Amino acid sequence: MSLLTEVETYVLSIVPSGPLKAEIAQRLEDVFAGKNTDLEALMEWLKTRPILSPLTKGILGFVFTLTVPSERGLQRRRFVQNALNGNGDPNNMDRAVKLYRKLKREITFHGAKEIALSYSAGALASCMGLIYNRMGAVTTEVAFGLVCATCEQIADSQHRSHRQMVITTNPLIRHENRMVLASTTAKAMEQMAGSSEQAAEAMEVASQARQMVQAMRAIGTHPSSSAGLKSDLLENLQAYQKRMGVQMQRFK
């Protein structure tokens, strides 16, 4: 796996699923391929994206700044600086300085990542802030190692939280989660269906599913009534893909 592929993988792992994630993935691909060279426009676009947490925006801004060639005097962006200040916690800043001193002696991506993984996400973000604000300088490879370690820490905590929700025995939470997933799947079906003649059927199934979820929420239904909703939708989506000549493995 190439360095940039690895960076893209880690960064995208902390972005919530949805149309925005696909858009960010495309921007990262363009930046890494040298196709997008207007850092100012890129940062302005990032600043106004909804849904993303300030820290995720800060990490993306840091990656864009590392990758896109820019004029030396280009102003640092406040939204990135604020996100990478470790919540203003002096302990984070102390640890960040110690980490920076170690990273300065490191020259490889994997070496930097290994060192950084023993620090908290707050200290890692503060260390990125030091480098972003030009208060410290490391090689691009080392900076990318720091980025990936930070993303791994964040993704780990997100995964723990997600797993807790998946294994919860609370029937109301499970019921709502199934309805949310069914609704999201229906939305994806509508986007994939496009404008072909066979699309009408897929669109109809997706539309009915969304109406059903709305009705279930409006009248309040038994928690077991949502079981299998998403699976039924995915079976319909696969049947549609087969007719279109698209052979894809099951979405799970």
From Swiss-Prot:
GO cellular component, one term: virion membrane
Molecular function terms from GO: RNA binding; structural constituent of virion
Region (RNP-binding): 165-252
Annotated region described as Membrane-binding, given as residue ranges: 1-164
Topology within the bilayer: Peripheral membrane protein
Name this protein carries in UniProt: Matrix protein 1
A Gene Ontology biological process term: viral budding from plasma membrane
Cellular compartment(s): Virion membrane; Host nucleus
Keyword RNA-binding: yes
Description of how the protein assembles with itself and partners: Homodimer and homomultimer. Interacts with NEP. Binds ribonucleocapsid by both interacting with genomic RNA and NP protein. May interact with HA and NA. Cannot bind NP without genomic RNA.
Xref: HAMAP family: INFV_M1
Residue ranges of the motif Nuclear localization signal: 101-105
Keyword Signal set for record: no
Organism (species): Influenza A virus (strain A/Leningrad/134/17/1957 H2N2)
Family of this protein: Belongs to the influenza viruses Matrix protein M1 family.
A Pfam family recorded for this sequence: Flu_M1
Functional description taken from the UniProt entry: Plays critical roles in virus replication, from virus entry and uncoating to assembly and budding of the virus particle. M1 binding to ribonucleocapsids (RNPs) in nucleus seems to inhibit viral transcription. Interaction of viral NEP with M1-RNP is thought to promote nuclear export of the complex, which is targeted to the virion assembly site at the apical plasma membrane in polarized epithelial cells. Interactions with NA and HA may bring M1, a non-raft-associated protein, into lipid rafts. Forms a continuous shell on the inner side of the lipid bilayer in virion, where it binds the RNP.
